[in-house]
C-alpha cells in the first residue's frame, strides 16, 4: 500500500509539472510578442519543481515594489512598532497615500506607517520609514538576504536623484526571494504583521483583477511611467504560489496594465486545473 501511495504522489507531481511546462510555453510565446521588457516567475512553495520563469534576472526600476524590502527590513529591526513619528519628519511628496491629506502636526505609529506604505502605497509613509531605518541599513539587509541585484538609492518621488542616476532596482528573482523570506518567517510576530499587511493590499487592478474578492493574494504593486509591476504569494487549495510579473520600457502604461490583467487571469485559471 505504501508503494501505491508513493506511485500516486509521483503521478500527481508529474502531472503538475506537465501543466507548468505547458503554462511556461504559453506565457513565453505571449509575453515575447508584447511591447516592452517583461519578466515573470511562478514558483510553488510546496513543490519547487513547479517553477517557471522568463527574464527573471533582468534588472527593472523597482517603482513601489522596493517598499516590500523596506517592510522586511523594518521587521528585522529593533524599532518599536508603537513609536509615533510626526509626518513632518521628512518633506512632503506627491503621489499615492493618505498622509499628505493630514495636518502637519499629525503623529503616526511605525506600524501604521508600514500598513499605509503597503496597503495604500503611501509615499510619505515610505519616506519616513526610509529615513528612520537608514537607507544604508535597508541596502545592507538586501545584501544580507543575498538579493544580488537589488538597489535602494533614493527616496520615493525624488526625481532629481533619478536624473542623477540614483535609482531603485529589483529583479523578479530578488523580489521572489524577498517574498519567500517574509513567508518563511511569518511565524514570528513582527513578520506575521508584514504578512497580514501584504494580504490587505488595496490595489487589485493588475494580476488579481479577475480573481474572486475572497482570494487572498499577499502582494504589492508598483508603477512608474512606462513601468508596471505586481507580485505576491497566493495561498489556494491547489497550492501556494509566488506569482510575479514585471514590465518595463512600455509604450503605454494602460496597455501594459491590461496585458498584466489578462496574464493574471490566465495564470490563475491554469494553476487551478486539477
Q: PLM features: what roles do these ranges have?
A:
Residues 37, 128-180:
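Mid-domain, small-residue-enriched loop/turn segments at the edges of structured enzyme/sensor domains
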Residues 84-96, 133-134:
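Acidic helix-start/capping segments at beta-turn-to-alpha-helix junctions
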Residues 1-19:
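Short, Lys/Arg-enriched N-terminal segments with co-localized hydrophobic residues
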Residues 48, 61-87, 243:
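Active-site SXXK
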Residues 93-128:
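Conserved catalytic neighborhood of penicillin-recognizing serine enzymes
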Residues 72-79, 119, 131, 177-184, ...:
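Short glycine/serine- and small hydrophobic-enriched flexible loop segments
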Residues 15-34, 51, 132, 183-205, ...:
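Structured C-terminal helix/loop/strand segments within mature extracytoplasmic catalytic/sensor domains
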Residues 36-59:
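Short, conserved catalytic-motif segment at the N-terminal edge
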Amino acid at each position: 500500500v505504501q508503494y501505491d501511495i508513493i506511485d500516486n504522489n509521483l503521478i500527481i507531481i508529474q502531472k503538475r509539472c506537465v501543466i507548468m511546462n505547458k503554462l511556461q510555453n504559453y506565457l513565453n510565446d505571449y509575453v515575447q510578442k508584447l511591447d516592452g521588457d517583461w519578466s515573470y516567475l511562478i514558483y510553488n512553495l510546496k513543490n519547487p519543481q513547479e517553477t517557471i520563469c522568463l527574464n527573471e534576472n533582468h534588472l527593472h526600476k523597482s517603482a513601489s515594489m522596493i517598499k516590500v524590502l523596506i517592510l522586511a527590513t523594518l521587521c528585522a529591526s529593533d524599532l518599536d512598532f508603537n513609536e509615533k513619528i510626526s509626518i513632518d519628519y521628512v518633506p512632503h511628496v506627491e503621489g499615492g497615500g493618505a498622509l499628505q491629506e493630514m495636518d502637519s502636526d499629525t503623529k503616526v505609529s511605525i506600524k501604521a506607517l508600514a500598513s499605509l506604505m503597503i496597503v495604500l502605497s503611501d509615499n510619505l509613509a515610505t519616506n519616513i520609514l526610509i529615513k528612520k531605518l537608514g537607507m544604508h541599513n535597508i541596502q545592507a539587509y538586501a545584501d544580507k538576504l543575498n538579493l544580488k541585484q537589488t538597489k535602494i538609492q533614493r527616496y520615493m518621488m525624488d526625481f532629481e536623484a533619478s536624473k542623477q542616476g540614483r535609482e531603485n532596482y529589483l529583479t523578479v528573482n530578488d523580489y521572489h526571494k524577498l517574498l519567500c523570506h517574509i513567508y518563511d518567517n511569518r511565524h514570528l510576530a513582527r513578520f506575521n504583521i508584514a504578512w497580514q499587511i501584504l494580504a490587505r493590499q488595496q490595489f487589485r487592478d493588475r494580476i488579481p483583477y479577475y480573481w474572486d474578492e475572497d482570494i487572498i493574494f499577499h502582494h504589492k504593486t508598483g508603477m512608474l511611467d512606462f513601468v508596471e509591476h505586481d507580485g505576491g504569494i497566493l495561498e489556494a487549495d491547489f497550492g501556494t504560489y509566488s506569482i510575479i510579473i514585471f514590465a518595463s520600457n512600455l509604450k503605454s502604461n494602460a496597455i501594459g496594465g491590461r496585458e498584466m490583467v489578462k496574464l493574471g487571469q490566465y495564470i490563475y485559471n491554469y494553476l487551478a486545473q486539477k
